[in-house]
């Protein structure tokens, strides 16, 4: 990690910029290979610095299905019916322990995401990951997901959404005690006091 330890931007000082990895970088004058990728986001850092941004929130950027299968009422699924609807946003269960490979300019999603985080931190910008946990998720899996992204990828915080967020379990653990946690309806400053 070349000395990277993450950033601790106080809530009251945070100037947060929320982006969708694919959607945000498609419009910019980037090399075609970098459009819609973590590498492409890395090229936006000087612009964010000019705006005074000190934290970037990534909408779901973990591995998730892009094509949603259609539910069949009766009968068998056929090849024709496999197309489904495109899931652009990622607000669904996924493979929570992996960066979205479709958001990579390289064939190494882990390395590309780590390089992006290091660039952000060198520029003084924190990374907040938005994670969606549905009601049916095991709370321990959700907790381990957050711990993993903090330890392995040096993510600075999380915006948690969905009915399956185990806030009590998350708040009891010490590993996330110095991590930014945002959750609708919870005043995080008072939650720890």
Q: Model-predicted segments: where are they?
A:
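The feature marks proteins involved in alpha-glucan
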Residues: 1-18, 26-32, 36
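Hydrophobic faces of well-ordered beta-strands that scaffold small-molecule active sites
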Residues: 15-17, 56-58, 127-129, 158, ...
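Conserved, mostly hydrophobic/aromatic
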Residues: 19, 48, 58, 96, ...
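Aromatic- and acidic-residue-enriched carbohydrate-binding clefts of CAZyme catalytic domains
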Residues: 30-37, 68-122, 133-155
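Catalytic domains of carbohydrate-active enzymes, especially glycoside hydrolases
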Residues: 43-62, 152
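Surface-exposed amphipathic alpha-helices with a cationic face
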Residues: 46-49, 114-123, 168-176
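Active-site-proximal loop/turn and secondary-structure-junction residues that shape catalytic pockets
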Residues: 62-64, 102, 131-135, 164, ...
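Active-site-proximal helices and loops of the catalytic beta/alpha 8
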Residues: 91, 145, 151-193
